[in-house]
């Protein structure tokens, strides 16, 4: 099973994934956790470039770097893990690119979606289920403000992050069978309980 966790800045994806992984391992599943950009040596190298506020990367170059990292990530890590029977949980995937670069970033939802869905062939490589940790932009940014160092996307203005939230919710509305929206203001364990019910329904 391939699970993706999406959400805006400060939604608590890292804590959610850690807690969800722990519960699934307790149920006897083999879990592989990963992230984007990252998840493989190429992805980790690209991550440093993409998140560095000092790097002046054009929007189209940024998009292509995300896609190159994802293509390698899918082939090198995700597909082999799934073929071996493991459950893969990824912190971000296609929809983050569609929202951050396509919708909020202005490159166009349809254009970016088409590129994402053909990054490893003619057919879209999609997760079995996507959990969207939904949080108001202001609340998420307040959480992030406690950190000492903010990456390029975390430093963007609140209007950008409001567009990110609206973009994710719009995608969730278009794909209700795949998307499950969780309230990121709830305690992490409460969200994990809800997620486990959805995962068990797919088994």
From Swiss-Prot:
- List keywords of the entry alphabetically: ATP-binding, Kinase, Nucleotide biosynthesis, Nucleotide-binding, Transferase
Task: Give the main EC class.
Answer: transferase
InterPro entries for this protein: P-loop_NTPase (IPR027417), Thymidylate_kin-like_dom (IPR039430), Thymidylate_kin_CS (IPR018095), Thymidylate_kinase (IPR018094)
Instruction: State where ATP binds.
Output: 7-14
Single GO MF annotation = dTMP kinase activity
Output a single Gene Ontology CC term carried by this record. Answer: cytosol
Transmembrane stretches, start-end = none
Q: Which reaction does it catalyse?
A: dTMP + ATP = dTDP + ADP
Gene Ontology annotations of biological process type: dTDP biosynthetic process; dTTP biosynthetic process; dUDP biosynthetic process
What CDD domains is this protein classified in? TMPK
Name-wise, this protein is Thymidylate kinase
The organism's lineage?
Bacteria, Pseudomonadati, Chlamydiota, Chlamydiia, Chlamydiales
């Amino acid at each position: 099973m391939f699970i993706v966790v999406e959400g805006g800045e400060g939604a608590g994806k890292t804590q959610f994934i850690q807690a969800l992984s722990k519960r699934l391992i307790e149920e006897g599943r083999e879990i592989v956790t990963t992230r984007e950009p990252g998840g493989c040596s190429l992805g980790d190298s690209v991550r440093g470039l993409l998140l560095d506020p000092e790097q002046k990367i054009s929007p189209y170059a940024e998009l292509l770097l995300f896609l190159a990292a994802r293509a390698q990530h899918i082939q090198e890590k995700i597909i082999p893990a799934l073929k071996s029977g493991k459950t893969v949980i990824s912190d971000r995937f296609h929809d983050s690119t569609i929202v951050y670069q396509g919708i909020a970033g202005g490159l166009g939802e349809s254009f970016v979606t088409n590129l994402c869905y053909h990054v490893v062939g003619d057919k879209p490589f999609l997760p079995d289920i996507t959990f969207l940790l939904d949080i108001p932009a202001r609340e998420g940014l307040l959480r992030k403000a406690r950190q000492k160092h903010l990456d390029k996307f975390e430093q963007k203005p609140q209007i950008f992050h409001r567009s990110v939230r609206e973009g994710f919710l719009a995608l969730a509305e278009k794909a209700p069978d795949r998307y499950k929206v969780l309230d990121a203001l709830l305690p992490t364990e409460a969200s994990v309980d809800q997620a486990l019910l959805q995962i068990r329904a797919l088994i």
